[in-house]
A protein has these predicted regions:
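Surface-exposed short loop/turn segments
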Residues: 21-33, 95-162
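Sec-exported extracytoplasmic/periplasmic mature domains
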Residues: 90, 94-98, 176-185
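Sec-dependent bacterial lipoprotein signal peptides
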Residues: 1-20
């Protein structure tokens, strides 16, 4: 009887500490580092094309990730992680004065992979996007970039769930930073 009560208490504690919530990532904001790097790169103005999920991938990969039990994280951009990549890049380009809806150069992207694992011990997340830069009919850049993160993930869901969402959101800034730093990308948009 005592063992059963202990197990029941443990199960109730797990349910209580994990709860259930639908977390929406914050609206992308420009970072000082990415904006500065864009301004220093001497790039031509550009516009953004479509950002979509790769054909054949499960739609859920673009919609949300489970965070222990009934908790989920989703993007504020029409519920699409691909659109969140686009918006993350858009705010950086706009902050650097490089966004022009009439520009010849177009940046587009395809979400190839999106993973989030908030397991106890070590949490992990990654996103992979294939970016393309075209000017007119000429493809000037095409490359898949991946951003990864690992963090200490608490046993307690009340700590681990927001931490996982925060680290996952940070991957988008990191990915945009990788794109901006890529010499081939800079060459494709050089003035």
């Amino acid at each position: 009887m005592k063992t059963t009560l202990v197990k029941l208490f443990a199960l109730a504690s797990v349910v209580l500490f994990t709860g259930c919530a639908q977390l929406t990532m914050g609206t992308p904001q420009p970072t000082a580092e990415n904006t500065t790097n864009l301004k220093r790169a001497n790039l031509a103005e550009t516009r953004l094309g479509s950002f979509t999920l790769e054909a054949g991938k499960p739609a859920q990969m673009d919609k949300g990730h489970s965070l222990r039990g009934a908790n989920t994280v989703q993007a504020p951009t029409n519920g699409s992680f691909a659109e969140y990549v686009r918006e993350s890049l858009r705010v950086e380009l706009a902050a650097a004065g490089l966004l022009d809806p009439k520009a010849d150069a177009v940046i587009s992207g395809v979400l190839l992979d999106s993973q989030l694992d908030p397991s106890m011990g070590t949490g992990k997340g990654s996103i992979q996007v294939r970016f393309t830069v075209t000017k007119g009919t000429e493809k000037r850049y095409e490359k898949a970039l991946t951003a990864r993160s690992e963090w200490e993930s608490s046993f307690m869901g009340a700590v681990a769930i927001p931490a996982a969402a925060q680290h996952y959101e940070g991957l988008y800034r990191k990915l945009v930073g990788q794109l901006i730093a890529d010499p081939d990308f800079r060459k494709a948009l050089a003035k």
